[in-house]
Regions:
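Alpha-helix initiation/capping motif
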Residues: 2, 20, 240-242
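Bacterial N-terminal signal peptides
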Residues: 11-23
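N-terminal secretory signal peptides that target proteins for export/translocation
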Residues: 1-8
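Predominantly soluble domains enriched in secretory-pathway, periplasmic, or organellar proteins
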Residues: 25-350
Length: 350
């Protein structure tokens, strides 16, 4: 997953900052709308960028990547209850609840940082491949997998011993991954326009499938019951794939800069968040038939999200942005810069 910072290409206008837990007017019944905002303050060092959000249903906490730290936020109140700080460049957070351990992919340090889920204190550092990005826990193998965007491989970690037990060549730049809970992991290979299936018990690649007509695969999630993958392409397409055959069943147009897809089993809804400021909501009518429910206008930059299955609320983070600079010879395609101190969580629900 690409971090959101000054290196992202887009056109933005300055949005006025959101205050803590601002209640907003109700939308029509049944439609997703903005319920509140949680102000999360400035990033350490003043440079705003962010990546994955992880929701822990047992503690009802959100783990939010923010520059060189992970902020831990109460999902119901927006209160910041702690942080894991002094990191280099945070990407993702994987939780191994039965061990009460969390694992942070620190891309700037080429390592995974281990912390205690209760005390939030760091307990270890694990060297990985270059720029660990996505990080997930696979319950079938009981291992943690990092997808390393610089070295094009995956580091396999035993969370009981905090050690790397295998390294898997991915054959391209790995992005978002999802585990099916039965021993298969599906990972987007962004620069190859592919999805690979990986046997998590043998640490071997089993299949490589094209995501065409989608390109630059980033976000992915899965309907495990019906074996469907939801793949976000940076060419503004959502591709729905059969996880057993690699067949692309259906596609939908989406906004630019997708970075999160979420499937909710209880409602059969698919949520797709994009950088341009759209939350697309689709429905699985049948395993081979999907439909558009609605497209919710969010805010520019709001492309990293998490879902609370209990309340059906979606949490998306973003910030305000300055104006786009004038093009120069050195920077022919300049990008707007996030404004320090405006980072926030947007909470959407019905």
């Amino acid at each position: 997953m690409k971090l959101f910072d000054a290196h992202q290409s887009a056109t933005a206008t300055i949005l006025l900052g959101g205050s803590l837990a601002v209640a907003l007017a109700a939308a029509p019944l049944g439609a997703y709308h903005l319920l509140t905002k949680y102000d999360l303050g400035a990033a350490p060092g003043g440079k705003e960028y962010w990546d994955y959000i992880t929701f822990d249903s047992s503690s009802r906490r959100l783990y939010v990547s923010h520059n060189t730290e992970v902020k831990v936020v109460e999902a119901d109140t927006g209160k910041i209850v702690g942080s894991i700080a002094d990191l280099k460049r945070v990407h993702g957070i994987a939780l191994v609840s039965h061990l009460e351990k969390g694992f942070i992919s620190d891309g700037g340090a080429d390592e995974v940082v281990v912390f205690d889920m209760k005390s939030l204190k760091v307990s270890g550092h694990i060297k990985t491949g270059g720029n660990p990005d996505c990080i997930i826990y696979d319950p079938a193998s009981k291992h943690v997998f990092t997808m390393n965007g610089k070295s094009n491989d995956s580091s396999v970690i035993d969370p009981a011993t905090d050690s790397v037990v295998a390294t898997i060549s991915m054959g391209g730049r790995p992005e978002y991954a999802v585990a099916d809970g039965k021993g298969m992991i599906y990972d987007n290979i962004e620069d190859k326009n592919e999805v690979v299936s990986l046997d998590s018990r043998t640490n071997t690649i089993k299949s490589r499938w094209s995501i065409a007509p989608a390109e630059e695969a980033t976000a992915v999630d899965m309907d495990m019951k019906h074996r469907r993958l939801f793949i976000g392409g940076r060419n503004k397409l959502l591709a729905i794939m059969d996880a057993d055959t690699g067949k692309v069943i259906q596609t939908f147009p989406i906004g630019s800069g997708v970075d999160t897809n979420i499937f909710e089993p209880g409602t059969d809804l698919i949520f797709t968040a994009t950088r341009e400021g759209t939350l697309h909501i689709f429905h699985e009518d049948a395993p081979d038939r999907f439909s558009i429910v609605e497209t919710v206008k969010t805010e520019f930059g709001a492309r990293n999200a998490a879902l609370d299955r209990k309340t059906h609320r979606v949490f998306i983070d973003t910030a305000d942005f300055g104006p786009t600079p004038e093009p120069t010879t050195e920077q022919p395609h300049p990008q707007p810069t996030p404004i320090s101190g405006t980072f926030r969580l947007l909470v959407y629900g019905r």
